[in-house]
């Protein structure tokens, strides 16, 4: 189940995602390989990134690889509501709303982690930080993850 601002925004988001797929083909070769090999079959991936068309495409590629993808924004001010609605429309569990409060943002992250992911793709370290604290009970299946930013790495090192 997704939490997005307004599902009626999906057509605009679908257009943006299609533009990325048409004019930014870097992931298309990987997607073709994933479609055949299904390297993530049986795995659940929680993805926290700037929720816009390019990163939405990454979520779709991971899904083609067999993953059960759960997508959220890593910054409530960068989340594009139409793209979030489009991903929900496409069947990807999406938790993202532009302009939410800090508490609402954390609640969306928690909703994302309720999938009990095997893998995490994080930008800023918010998902991984929650698994090390408030949501420790949701990380029992976790086998790996990646953090995009130096800031996120520093946050995680500080938790040691």
Enumerate the predicted regions with their spans.
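N-terminal ligand-binding/catalytic initiation module
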Residues: 1-160
């Amino acid at each position: 189940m997704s939490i997005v601002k307004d599902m009626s925004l999906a057509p605009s988001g679908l257009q943006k995602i299609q533009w990325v797929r048409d004019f930014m083909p870097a992931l298309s070769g990987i997607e073709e390989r994933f479609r055949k090999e299904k390297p993530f079959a049986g795995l659940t991936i929680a993805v926290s990134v700037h929720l816009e068309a390019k990163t939405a495409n990454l979520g779709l590629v991971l899904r083609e690889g067999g993953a059960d993808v759960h997508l959220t924004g890593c910054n409530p001010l960068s989340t594009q509501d139409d793209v979030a609605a489009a991903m929900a429309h496409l069947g990807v569990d999406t938790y993202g709303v532009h302009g939410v409060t800090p508490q609402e943002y954390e609640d969306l992250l928690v909703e994302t982690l309720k999938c009990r992911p095997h893998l995490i793709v994080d930008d800023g370290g918010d998902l991984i930080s929650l698994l090390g604290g408030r949501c420790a009970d949701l990380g029992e299946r976790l086998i790996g993850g990646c953090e995009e930013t130096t800031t996120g790495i520093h946050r995680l090192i500080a938790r040691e």
